[in-house]
Amino acid sequence: MLKFVPVDFKELKNPYSEDSTLCGYVGYDLTDNSKCGECAFRLNGYSMEIIFVEAADNDAETIEGLIRSALNYGGNRSVYIANYKADAGIDVAVLLGFEDENGVLTGDIPTLLKGSCCKGK
């Protein structure tokens, strides 16, 4: 089982820990309470940018959980549009419903949160 916890930007890995405009989530594997991933994102009014996602062994389910956590965080703060700019997890982002729009993966948060998961259920 995994747990995703919002963190202050200072708790993110460098160089993200130096950018006060960022928000973040850290994922933990509850079997041994070890850190298994993190993501960084920025809220920009009604839109957000997911700029960094990292998971141990590039685990798709962990990446999905981090992306969904970030989307939920933004959605709860009146953000409507999400742009996925991270280098990792692009395949997972596409499964969730992000679509290429002028070279940037984009989607509206309500639709993205309804997207297919990595297990295809």
Please annotate each region the language model reported.
Residues 1-28, 116-121:
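Short amphipathic alpha-helix that is part of the acyltransferase structural core
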Residues 25-61, 65:
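Conserved donor-binding loop and adjoining core beta-sheet/short helix segment
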Residues 40-43, 82, 97-98:
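Short, exposed beta-strand/loop patches in secreted or surface proteins that constitute
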Residues 67-75:
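A conserved short alpha-helix in the GNAT/GCN5 acetyltransferase fold that borders
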Residues 74-87:
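Conserved GNAT acetyl-CoA-binding A-motif
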Residues 87-103:
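Conserved active-site alpha-helix within GNAT-family acetyltransferase domains
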Residues 102-121:
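C-terminal "cap" of GNAT-fold acetyltransferases
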